[in-house]
């Protein structure tokens, strides 16, 4: 027997998120339920994009730090943002990189939408690989960003070979670290 979704009940719906209870029948025929949080808007499409932006020839990656109320602390993350209706992931990546960091770059590739935390949400996120021309931002320059009024984003240029040390320093400052950064560090430790 295949797993079957029987019905879904919305418990709460807000501007950006909704919470629902999903009733399903598992592979053994047992009726079960699950609580989930979903993004609102853009049904059937990816909801957000996160950006791995490499500054060349400096071999640096752009990271941000901002307070995240659900985590209750400052988080170190890759730049990211929601895909607006009518936008492509590429357009969103260019816009969000500029708004959050002030950097302008070109999109090298975008993945299909992947799931950020499939045990909790159906949110689909696209990874945008971007390249920034470091000659436009010499001597470690960080341009003025264009963040929204509600944001308080700090921007970092981190040498790829120094990423592990940077993460340790941020942990020592009691910052949370986005799991995507730990994934990048793990791949780096494998020599990939």
Q: What does each model-identified segment do?
A:
Residues 62, 77, 127-129:
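Conserved beta-strand segments that form the floor/walls of ligand-binding pockets within enzyme
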Residues 70-76:
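A conserved beta-turn-beta hairpin within the catalytic core of GNAT-like acetyltransferases
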Residues 11-52, 57:
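Acidic, metal-coordinating catalytic segment for phosphate/diphosphate chemistry
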Residues 38-40, 66-70:
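Short, solvent-exposed aromatic-acidic interface loops
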Residues 56, 61-64:
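Glycine/small-residue-rich phosphate/adenosyl-binding loop
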Residues 176-192:
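Short, amphipathic C-terminal "tail helix"
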Residues 2-12:
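Short amphipathic beta-strand and strand-loop transition segments with alternating hydrophobic
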Residues 48-50, 81-175:
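Unchanged
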